[in-house]
Amino acid sequence: MACCRNGILTLTSVVAFLSGGPVGAQDTPLPLARIEGRITVDGRPNEPAWQAIPPLPLTMFAPVFRGTPTQRTEIRVAYDDDHIYAAGWFYDEDPSGIRINSLYRDRWNGDDAFAIYLDPFNDNRNAKWFGTTPAGIRFEQLVSDDGATLNGSWDTFWEARTTITEEGWFAEVRIPFSSLGFQALDGQAVMGLTVTRLVSRLNERVTFPEIDPRFDFRQPSVARDIVLTDVQTTRPLYATPYALTGVEQSPVLATDRTAFITERDVPREVGLDLRYPISSELTFDLSVNTDFAQVEADDQQVNLDRFSLFFPEKRRFFQERSEIFDFIMGSSGGRLFHSRQIGLASGVRVPVLGGARLVGRAGAWDVGLLDMHTESTDGLPSENFGVARVKRGILNPYSSAGAMVTSRMSDGERNHAYGLDANIRMFGDDYLSLRWAQTFDDDERSSIDFMDRSQYYINWARRATRGLSYEASTTRSGSDYAPASGFLPRRDFTTANFISNYFIFTDEHPVFRRVYPGALAFSTFRNSDGVLESGQYAVWVQWDTKAGGGGWIEPKLFREDVQEAFLIGDVVEVPAGRYTFADLQLVLTMASGNRLRANMDARAGSYFDGTRAQIILTPTWNASPHLEIGGDYQFTRLRFDDRNTGADIHLARLRLRAALDARASGNALLQYNSTTDRLAVNFRIRYNFAEGTDLWLVYDETLATERFLNDEGLRDPFSASRAFVLKYSHTFQF
């Protein structure tokens, strides 16, 4: 029997090891109260039905864990046959200090805030975040990979109303079950729940449940399980047709090559988006003649090394539920799928004929299917893009494994890729992440080595924000690995990376909330000869203040082996050779709740065979809740005295956000890049009649700040392109 007992103890230990804690350590699920009586969602939670709901016990999360909140808060959550309700009584001893920095829809901007997080499938990995400010501005996000990924471009149907009095501010929220999706067994659903209140000017946050700061309060794994009984979801069909018109013009050289003439086009487009929940857990989207006219222009960048720049996806159709399609191969390995490959060629829009998407859950599996087709235009062939992604929990509530397949096809050319991945919580805060992928082209030689067409990524990390955290990883990418539907910054390399922090909370200090020294060593080797191609080695001290600011100071050493000369910012050449150089970086940030704030990033030191001095300033002024003025200015001074060359590079960005109220808003983005001598202008005005019904006016223009002479002796036109677009979309619910 002793051997049996030892076997049982060993099995129990293994289960505890894999689950990251003692067996049976989960709290008993909390039965959520059912609303008895009528509630009007008007921001005045004074109905008797609310008083019958017990308030949730709240704990200070920041600035001092388990400290005494300075402002009184009550939060109640309940449900009825069709909705989840939440109400907050956010008392404030200084109502004039309540932060309302912006009325801009879908944007938290350092305001006071109330948020409710729901993990509808109770998988401890994914959640839906619904937040509102004292002005009633709503923002929502999808949380995935246990808080590692936040997607703020997701939109759904729900309500939030607020009021402000001399006592503070008050909120009511109503979330339809149809906007959640959940699994119900015999009419019973178990979800994860977290609620928070933020007093922005004090950087004070309270939460339910109590959450240790070594975790992020947005992690679904720290939510409290709740139980709803006698519930079921509905499955409405949403249809969103749109109509678009406008004027587009661009200069072209006349046939006699003596002058530029203006070509004009008047687009007239209609299209349709359909969304239907096939089940309470699985949603189907169909898009016909997909349009992205209202998308904000890309933030311009200056390439200061020899590897490809990464531009994030800004198109809402692809951002929505994009987390299911994430397959990231570490900081150097790129992505197996990057949706910017669809409908964009070198940043220029390509018409998208349409496509379909299926996302959600089928049993224990997270599922994502995407198929999109682009139109042939300007010498580019029509293309088809396909993606299939599956993922499911394994071993314990905090681990998952999955697979992905992608395809890109055009005119007989095909590229296929597939990959396998796993994220495993080994014990405590330690996780093992594994990724492996392989690509094939139609014309690929059968003699290509297995590893040459493959890429793998192995990462062991302690994901802690208290005490010691660390991350050790390696990535290897073969010379013939080429994901045509993804993003790959460099090819044929192997990395060995390590990074570590030690988080020290300073609860008794009047200024600092935590201080965390750290170090990193990133090394990238060429597979062809094993030589170190790039190396970064650094130590730093970083800090967060109780007021919400922070910063760090970081000396860093670089090693670079350049085989072929390249241009920095398209203006200065770096010759082939081996280089060792170093710099010092200082970053200072101010609390996001300040109406006038600025961040600074400054660095100076040697750079390849010369020197670099750089400063980045990002000021923001919330002049009123109706107007935000923000900007970025990056100045880089490069000098290579031994070669008697250098450059001053300027990148400036001015962004204006204006809102009359929660429905009417405008956005202006002006960007200047000295490496291209271009000024890009983007204006967008939106009127939101109702959720899903919008009118957009968009103006885009690119101006030449330096008009060069061409071969015919003509100066470049002042306006390189101009477009004015009017778009209306309306959502019908059936």
Where are these regions (language model features)?
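N-terminal secretory signal peptides that target proteins for export/translocation
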Residues: 1-5
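Bacterial N-terminal signal peptides
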Residues: 8-19
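Structural preference for beta-rich elements and adjacent junctions enriched in aromatics
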Residues: 25-392, 402
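Short loop/turn motifs that connect adjacent beta-strands in outer-membrane beta-barrel proteins
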Residues: 181-189, 229-237, 276, 281, ...
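Extended, hydrophobic alpha-helical segments in both membrane/secreted and soluble proteins
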Residues: 241, 268-274, 282, 288, ...
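Conserved short loop/turn motifs at secondary-structure junctions
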Residues: 259-260, 271-273, 288-293, 373-376, ...
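Exposed, low-structure sequence patches enriched in small/polar residues
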Residues: 351, 435-734
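Beta-propeller domains
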Residues: 376-391, 395-458, 464
